[in-house]
């Protein structure tokens, strides 16, 4: 994958565990969505799963190259704290990925986990786990305030890029 010697990918989820249950028993049975600290993962019927199924059917990836892990709230919180102790400030979603990776790694293996959100988006979680004032909101984001959904550019944001519509 991407020219890297990747043995497997881990589909890490929070308590909304439809994919891991399906991977284990072959039954696609979405349950009611459970609110969690990693709220962007609060999806009980992920609409991107058919893409994975298609890649499997085409032989692009093999079943043995995909693992699944469910990370509960306590483990997510532990991940935030552990990563902080390692000098990395993580938000809950990356902490889910980190804890899943820690469980899956075999002796002698190395791994990579990915996260895309900034910890400042989760002030309640960060303060509860690491204390007040740990996460600094970048000045440019604090000054900008919330974005609208109409594609307007921020005032003063003249960097030559076009606004994106959502």
Which residues fall in each region the model found?
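PLP-dependent amino-acid enzyme catalytic core
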Residues: 1-166
């Amino acid at each position: 994958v991407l020219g890297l010697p990747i043995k497997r990918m881990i589909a890490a989820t929070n308590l909304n565990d439809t994919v891991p249950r399906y991977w284990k028993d072959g039954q696609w049975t979405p349950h009611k969505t459970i609110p969690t600290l990693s709220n962007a993962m609060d999806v009980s019927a992920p609409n991107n799963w058919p893409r994975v199924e298609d890649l499997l059917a085409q032989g692009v990836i093999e079943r043995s190259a995909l693992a699944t892990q469910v990370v509960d709230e306590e483990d997510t919180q532990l991940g935030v704290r552990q990563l902080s102790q390692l000098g990395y400030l993580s938000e809950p979603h990356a902490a889910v990925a980190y804890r899943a990776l820690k469980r899956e790694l075999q002796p002698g293996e190395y791994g990579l986990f990915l996260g895309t959100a900034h910890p400042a988006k989760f002030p309640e979680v960060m303060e509860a786990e690491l204390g007040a004032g740990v996460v600094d909101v970048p000045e440019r984001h604090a000054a900008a305030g919330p974005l609208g959904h109409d594609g307007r550019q921020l005032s003063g944001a003249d960097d030559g890029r076009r606004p994106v519509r959502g």
